[in-house]
Curated annotation (Swiss-Prot):
Topology in the lipid bilayer: Multi-pass membrane protein
Descriptive protein name: Proton-coupled amino acid transporter 3
One Gene Ontology CC term in the entry: vacuolar membrane
Biased composition (Polar residues): 10-20
Location within or outside the cell: Membrane
Tissue specificity note: Specifically expressed in testis.
Record organism: Homo sapiens
One annotated GO molecular function: L-proline transmembrane transporter activity
PANTHER family: AMINO ACID TRANSPORTER (PTHR22950), PROTON-COUPLED AMINO ACID TRANSPORTER 3 (PTHR22950:SF258)
Protein's GO biological process: glycine transport; L-alanine transport; proline transmembrane transport; proton transmembrane transport
A Pfam family that the UniProt record links to this protein: Aa_trans
Extracellular side: 68-71, 159-185, 232-252, 306-337, 389-392, 447-470
Entry keywords, A to Z: Membrane, Transmembrane, Transmembrane helix
Amino acid sequence: MSLLGRDYNSELNSLDNGPQSPSESSSSITSENVHPAGEAGLSMMQTLIHLLKCNIGTGLLGLPLAIKNAGLLVGPVSLLAIGVLTVHCMVILLNCAQHLSQRLQKTFVNYGEATMYGLETCPNTWLRAHAVWGRYTVSFLLVITQLGFCSVYFMFMADNLQQMVEKAHVTSNICQPREILTLTPILDIRFYMLIILPFLILLVFIQNLKVLSVFSTLANITTLGSMALIFEYIMEGIPYPSNLPLMANWKTFLLFFGTAIFTFEGVGMVLPLKNQMKHPQQFSFVLYLGMSIVIILYILLGTLGYMKFGSDTQASITLNLPNCWLYQSVKLMYSIGIFFTYALQFHVPAEIIIPFAISQVSESWALFVDLSVRSALVCLTCVSAILIPRLDLVISLVGSVSSSALALIIPALLEIVIFYSEDMSCVTIAKDIMISIVGLLGCIFGTYQALYELPQPISHSMANSTGVHA
């Protein structure tokens, strides 16, 4: 069972049966053929593990700098607000998908299909005629966002591997406050990326979520261990934050928004995870529990990290930790967690692109094309990480554009489109419009600031360190 329960034979056969409508024809290559409820599916615990791992990524380590960019008061409050809005929009998306699946008598509709079918019910003639572009737009944004996550993961793992290997001779057994060491790299970071590349290619060949849940459990254990060490250090002797600004400059706040919205990485996995549950009706409880844990963790780490290091807060909190073997292990454990998280985030673009690719070949070539496309996409994320020196700003850009649209703008507008004709209250309409405006403003101004900062010169070491921890 793959993430979306795809079966090559049924998928290829469905192409020969003839669609019932133009919309179904256009979406047949990405429709998920799900298992009936009650068959082998994910348990609540397995789903919770996947949900946590999807949302606890590299962005978590950059939250102290994000709080610094917003201010000691404005940062945590804004992070809480973004978290609540994101979860609310996840619930909206789930409700819209469930409503459409019941109306159309479908077992399941994905994000793109929900957008397309929703536009088909819109009173506007032009939108109805071009409803399929709603699915294309969502699919494009999902691919860009998820592959952007994967590119960050590549740089993160390579940078940490480089630091652990090349700074081994200056790493001590005594843990003292960090002295920032500027060492000339022995090997280019691209060499470390190429070392990681074949292992990630093999990892993404695993399509079974129940198998991946084992790796997710291991990833959560290593991440929990690294978080325990980080919290143990930052909570020891926190200085009184009297000199820290409660509100930062508005320009840096725009970068905070892009980073914060990017940090909530799991919006693309919400519908597939619910689809793969043995009892999908339990997903709401899993979502609220999991995202509550995530939001609390984000606020605590970001706020305490900034209070601990103040103006010296680095792009990743790991750069502020003592240069000893105990805290070097944080990089190793977190990198292991990110390694397995790569496979989860990779599933979404793979399941959008691969069905189209295999529909162009005969059944005998389906498996070969599947594995080839997976390998090519992993290589693409590697090349992206190699070519982009300021990945921190690129991720802020991706967060401002793609993540804002997927997490805030589209779900809110989709609720209006789908439920407007069903006596939708004015309060709900106003709420959805406000959410869309917040997402749109963040998208516009966050994009502007990221593009403004992108051409600015930056040292090689800073490019590496900031690039992986956005």
